[in-house]
Amino acid sequence: MSVEKAKAYWQLMRMDRPIGTLLLLWPTLWALIIAAEGTPDWHVLLVFVLGVVLMRSAGCVINDFADRKVDGHVKRTQQRPLPSGRVTAKEAIILFLLLGISSFLLVLTMNPLTIQLSFAGIVLAFIYPFMKRYTHLPQLFLGLAFSWAIPMAWAAQANELPWVVWFVFAINALWTIAYDTQYAMVDRDDDVHIGVKSTAILFGRHDKLIIGLLQLLTLVMLVWLGLHYQLGQSFYWSVLAAGALFVYQQHLIRHRQRELCFQAFLNNNYVGMVLALGLFVAFW
């Protein structure tokens, strides 16, 4: 394999842009920390960190495969490996299968409940990229896909799925819809032109308000989670920090400028990080 081909595969998996991996990793760590009520099992932690990297990469590959005929018409995505011809559709599918199989082999080291849950995760990862053609709610499907690691991680750590798992699942899904709508605001004009659907288009002039409401509901549910587990001040400080970051994001998107909307999206990495840190300290 040539250096250029390897570089194209690397870019196709978005290994040069880790934001998506981080946004998937943080809620996975939330689940592991809460399920373990502190430090998770090291084997489980390693499997899920590696699994997050592999599955996020697989998701990027199948997403670009699904979008290969439209990415060439969007300024931000014209130079991606598939529309630029550096990777063929067949090569992308083979890479997706290799990543998916590698992820599944990792899951096979977990308990039966986790293995059963993994099948739904694979389905969600595969269908999400195609939703933008059929519904204005692809961000909802991303919320489901990015949140599915939560019940899987919880099951791997505790071998059970109490109802609170789905509460944490909902928290992350709401947050994901909010930040992916910010991301969709970057491409809104191009998406309207080529017929791709998104919540940014659906919400229209109410986009900032609805993002704000989703963020507010996320914070309220986080506070309730802290009360349920009787967590200490460190967790509430992390929720307060997340709220401050949400306010900053609202400031960034106030004029709907592409670059600033993208910065708001990237800022969500810090939201996930401070919440993971707050949970870890609270359960320590």
Curated annotation (Swiss-Prot):
Q: What is its main location?
A: membrane
Q: Which reaction does it catalyse?
A: all-trans-octaprenyl diphosphate + 4-hydroxybenzoate = 4-hydroxy-3-(all-trans-octaprenyl)benzoate + diphosphate
Cofactor names: Mg(2+)
Which is one GO molecular function term here?
Answer: 4-hydroxybenzoate polyprenyltransferase activity
Q: Name one GO biological process term.
A: ubiquinone biosynthetic process
Output the Gene Ontology cellular-component terms. Answer: plasma membrane
**What EC number(s) would the UniProt record show?**
2.5.1.39
- Keyword Membrane among record annotations: yes
User: What keywords tag this UniProt record?
Assistant: Cell inner membrane, Cell membrane, Magnesium, Membrane, Transferase, Transmembrane, Transmembrane helix, Ubiquinone biosynthesis
Q: Which InterPro entries match?
A: HB_polyprenyltransferase-like (IPR006370), Prenyltransferase (IPR039653), UbiA_prenyltransferase (IPR000537), UbiA_sf (IPR044878)
Pathway assignment reads: Cofactor biosynthesis; ubiquinone biosynthesis
Q: Does the keyword S-adenosyl-L-methionine apply?
A: no
Q: Where in the cell is it found?
A: Cell inner membrane
Record-annotated membrane-spanning stretches: 18-38, 42-62, 93-113, 136-156, 161-181, 209-229, 233-253, 264-284
Q: How does the protein associate with the membrane?
A: Multi-pass membrane protein
| Function per UniProt | Catalyzes the prenylation of para-hydroxybenzoate (PHB) with an all-trans polyprenyl group. Mediates the second step in the final reaction sequence of ubiquinone-8 (UQ-8) biosynthesis, which is the condensation of the polyisoprenoid side chain with PHB, generating the first membrane-bound Q intermediate 3-octaprenyl-4-hydroxybenzoate.
Q: Which NCBIfam families match?
A: ubiA_proteo
What family does this belong to?
A: Belongs to the UbiA prenyltransferase family.
> Which PANTHER family is this protein grouped with?
4-HYDROXYBENZOATE POLYPRENYLTRANSFERASE, MITOCHONDRIAL, PRENYLTRANSFERASES
What protein name applies here?
Answer: 4-hydroxybenzoate octaprenyltransferase
Q: Record the organism.
A: Vibrio vulnificus (strain CMCP6)
Q: Which gene encodes it?
A: ubiA
